[in-house]
């Protein structure tokens, strides 16, 4: 959505056959009709060698590793890391969204924005701007927050920025009626708690409500809990489902995959942490 550069335009995916037929005809046509028109065509042949040369004759060996500083351009920032999961998660419902929120809604994929993809500090300013252009500023002011969504939250291309930027802005959990599979995995990878809520809970929660996960979150995640109790405005409670593999629980409890990898590196190297850059 919006990838063509026009706000209200749509871009559709098609099969390679449809794309090839359109390229040959200059318009969208049924590739089966084009096949009948062109008749039998032989695909170009490619001869593969019986054996590939496995030598390193054409490879220039690198110099020995040195402790030089990594030189980065002005638009390349550090990758944000999240602290390990704590006992408490709660905050303002920063945004309540409808069904089928895509990763393009979460982080627009237009050229004027994607140039900041290596600068999370800047890129996060555009988070959910296609839904509410005040979101980023409100999230920064709130420090900790919750997102609420309908069905199929996070559908579309599997860009990690769609989880990383909300995390950078202080979002701690997403309550949705269902999640797109890959985006849900990315939420785990960046330490955000995905909880599945029913229709009644979705209908009752309003933007601006304070939502708190009642349980000791870190302990519940590690111990295999499959549901959490959420309290809204200290007024009413609901049950939210939590479905995660053992590996996903380990990643989430650590604060995300990057934080977990750093922890494991420190353990394996006797406490020497890699440079942040």
Residue spans of the language-model regions?
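Fe-S-dependent hydro-lyases/dehydratases of central metabolism
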Residues: 1-277
């Amino acid at each position: 959505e919006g990838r063509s550069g026009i706000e209200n335009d749509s871009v559709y995916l098609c099969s390679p056959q449809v794309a090839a037929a359109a390229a040959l005809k200059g318009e969208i046509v049924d590739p089966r009709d084009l096949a009948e028109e062109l008749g039998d065509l032989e695909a170009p042949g490619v001869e593969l060698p019986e054996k590939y040369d496995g030598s390193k004759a054409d490879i220039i060996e690198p110099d020995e590793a040195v402790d030089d500083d990594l030189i980065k351009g002005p638009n390349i920032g550090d990758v944000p890391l999240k602290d390990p999961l704590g006992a408490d998660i709660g905050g303002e419902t920063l945004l309540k969204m409808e069904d089928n929120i895509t990763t393009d809604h979460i982080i627009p994929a237009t050229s004027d924005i994607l140039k900041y993809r290596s600068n999370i500090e800047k890129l996060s300013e555009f988070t959910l701007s296609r839904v509410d252009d005040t979101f980023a500023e409100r999230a920064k002011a709130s420090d900790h927050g919750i997102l609420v969504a309908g069905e199929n939250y996070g559908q579309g291309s599997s860009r990690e920025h769609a989880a990383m930027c909300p995390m950078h802005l202080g979002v701690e959990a997403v309550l949705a009626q269902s999640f797109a599979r890959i985006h849900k995995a990315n939420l785990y990878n960046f330490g955000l708690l995905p909880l599945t809520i029913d229709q009644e809970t979705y209908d009752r929660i309003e933007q601006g409500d304070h939502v708190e996960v009642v349980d000791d979150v870190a302990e519940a995640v590690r111990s295999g809990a499959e549901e959490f109790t959420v309290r809204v405005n200290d007024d009413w409670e609901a049950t939210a489902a939590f479905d995660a593999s053992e590996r996903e629980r380990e990643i989430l409890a650590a604060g995300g995959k990057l934080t977990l990898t750093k922890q494991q590196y420190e353990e394996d190297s006797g406490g020497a942490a890699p440079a942040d850059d």
